Swiss-Prot record:
Pfam families: Bac_luciferase (PF00296). PANTHER family: BLR5498 PROTEIN, LUCIFERASE-LIKE MONOOXYGENASE. One of its GO terms (cellular component) is cytosol. The keyword Ribonucleoprotein does not apply. This is Uncharacterized protein y4vJ. It comes from Sinorhizobium fredii (strain NBRC 101917 / NGR234).
Length: 351
């Protein structure tokens, strides 16, 4: 079982400068390596305060120079918003400067707000994503490639800086689509999934969807890696827990607004947080998620691992305006106590 950090780089208000958010995110990635996490993932979003990282590859390249062993991943490159031939060149370059530590997460995107500002029809995102992934695979595997598709025409093209990892860096697809999951299994890619703030029942349903997708390609679930994105927090301090839950719910509210075009902003940038009918109470979130005392978090993680059987759990660390020093202590706590305890319990169960 691997553990990763997922770093969103959110800004909850102007009391946080954008520079401080980015610096805090980088600091969390560096500490993630020191604490023993296998991977640090960076999101991609645009034009608002939900997330301040416009290019996760830039974050990977920067953090590669500040770390030495941790894997560094894009979670995710939103393919319909890219020229794939340029993205290919950047992927090769970043894997080289990261000494072969790049984990390449890709997805189709979901925020209408972003697509409108790039002039891309979000209804066509799945088809554009599929074609872009075709192009990435050609460019990564072939010395010279061409492409003729519905959305793009590319003459014979060579990428000058090739990835160190052959034939490609590990590719992770973020999706809730069974069709896209099936493609991942067919082509040997990994999956990045989430149950949002739901509990074991949703994780069980998710396991069934993945199993069906794998089976449709004659595969077993274990034939590809599965990473679960999860909000987790361990503490005996009720105020800390409430602050983490509050920031997690803040992020979810903004995500839903950006997806459903309900976003409101007085200045065109900082989105107003609005309650929604999908909001969960703090008590429900505590019940559903690995949140609470150290023992409660360990026990809950083991339950969730038993249901979903993921290969990796990526915990959300940079949410809203949660206190940076407190989160750094939390990352250290995972390295000191939670990860070793979970690994020990899993080792006993497998023996």
């Amino acid at each position: 079982m691997e553990f990763a950090t997922f770093i969103l780089a959110a800004q909850r208000g102007y009391h946080q400068s954008s520079a401080s958010v980015i610096r805090n995110s980088i600091e969390q990635a560096i500490l993630s390596e020191q604490a023993g996490f296998s991977t640090a993932w960076f999101a991609e979003h645009h034009f608002n305060n939900y997330s301040l990282v416009p290019s996760p590859l830039l974050m990977v390249a920067h953090c590669a120079g500040l770390t030495s062993t941790i894997r560094l991943g894009t979670a995710v490159c939103v393919l319909p918003l890219y020229q794939p031939q340029r993205l290919l060149a950047e992927i090769g370059f970043v894997d080289v400067v990261a000494n072969g530590r790049l984990e390449l997460g890709v997805g189709s995107g979901y925020q209408q707000f972003e697509f409108d500002r790039f002039g891309v029809n979000i209804d066509e995102a799945p088809a554009i994503f599929s074609e872009c992934l075709d192009i990435l695979l050609k460019g990564l595997k072939q010395k010279i490639f061409t492409h003729s598709g519905r959305y793009m025409q590319i003459p014979p093209t060579a990428i000058s800086v090739r990835t160190l990892q052959k034939p490609t860096p590990p590719i992770w697809i973020a999706t809730a689509s069974s069709k896209t999951m099936a493609r991942a299994y067919r082509e040997g890619h990994n999956l990045f999934v989430t149950a949002l703030h739901d509990g074991l029942e949703t994780l069980g349903l998710l396991r069934g969807i993945i199993k069906t997708a794998a089976g449709s390609e004659g595969k077993e679930v274990r034939d590809s890696k599965v990473s679960l994105l999860r909000c987790c927090y361990a503490s005996d301090d009720g105020a800390e827990i409430n602050s983490y839950i509050d920031n997690a719910r803040f992020q979810r509210r903004l995500s839903e607004a950006l997806q459903q075009r309900r976003q409101q902003s007085k200045d065109g940038y900082m989105l107003e947080e609005m309650p929604t009918h999908q909001d969960l109470s703090f008590d429900t979130m505590r019940k559903n998620l690995p949140i609470g005392s150290i023992n409660r978090v360990i026990d809950r993680l083991l339950e969730e691992i038993d249901v979903l059987k993921p290969d990796q759990i990526a915990i959300q660390t940079q949410l809203g305006d949660f206190d940076q020093k407190t989160m750094l202590r939390q990352i250290e706590l995972w390295g000191d106590k939670i990860i070793p305890a979970v690994q020990k319990s899993l080792g006993r169960s497998e023996a």
